[in-house]
């Protein structure tokens, strides 16, 4: 018998899970998402990606500012859900919310717990040079991503993979895992494993202040920094263009041959020296412009070495 579910999520990452649960035949009685925000040139209020998908599916959407009032808890409990599915909702669930569904609340988290608990696991896994990443279905408790784990999906990481690439790979994988978890829950077969006490790390929210590239670091670290922050907020540097230092986001790069003073342009194909080795820019973006492949950028803005990149 299909489950009565409450779905709680906000960004694009959560949409495949909502869509797949609905396609699996579960009765999604309500969707909780964050409030609409001004967006675009006209700064019109734009519902979240999850709210838009819920409206397309004909599911009621709730966007409370808080879940910590008795009224919010009563409204949540009134749905008499078997379970709540939480994917990047963006709000901490208080104990009355966690306790309301018959079988509890289940979170899809984008890391291999207990590594990278917290807000930015995808970015931090790439920035740290982890060999693999993944998603886990866990039963939520009051702690920060400390619940018992039910199912795990893994993806090998490569030097070429950006945070955007990993996001797009984990979202559908996570959707499949959550559908399987709900199927096992429905059959009374879902089992859990406690997280190890060793290996706990925290994925702090990305701060724009950490986005500037430090060319004194080894090339591999610079590459991971760039790819871990791509596309948002975007690792940046200043290129000397027509006598001015112009801020440019670097979205994709590769390791390159060569060496020199860190931050020196080594050739006419955007190879830049790092503290050890070099990287070559493959994709970049100027402020207010669309992302460009490096070869297209160089057609309009040829740069000749040696130049100092800040």
Curated annotation (Swiss-Prot):
Q: Which reaction does it catalyse?
A: L-methionyl-tRNA(fMet) + (6R)-10-formyltetrahydrofolate = N-formyl-L-methionyl-tRNA(fMet) + (6S)-5,6,7,8-tetrahydrofolate + H(+)
Q: Which Pfam families match?
A: Formyl_trans_C, Formyl_trans_N
- EC number(s)? 2.1.2.9
Gene3D superfamilies per record: Formyl transferase, C-terminal domain (3.10.25.10), Formyl transferase, N-terminal domain (3.40.50.170)
Q: Which UniProt keywords apply?
A: Protein biosynthesis, Transferase
An example GO CC term for this entry is: cytosol
Q: Do the record's keywords include Protein biosynthesis?
A: yes
User: Where is (6S)-5,6,7,8-tetrahydrofolate bound in this sequence?
Assistant: 111-114
**Enzyme class, one word?**
transferase
Which GO MF terms does the UniProt record name? methionyl-tRNA formyltransferase activity
What is the annotated role of this protein in its UniProt record? Answer: Attaches a formyl group to the free amino group of methionyl-tRNA(fMet). The formyl group appears to play a dual role in the initiator identity of N-formylmethionyl-tRNA by promoting its recognition by IF2 and preventing the misappropriation of this tRNA by the elongation apparatus.
Q: Of which family is this protein a member?
A: Belongs to the Fmt family.
The name on file for this protein is Methionyl-tRNA formyltransferase
Originating organism: Rhodopseudomonas palustris (strain BisB18)
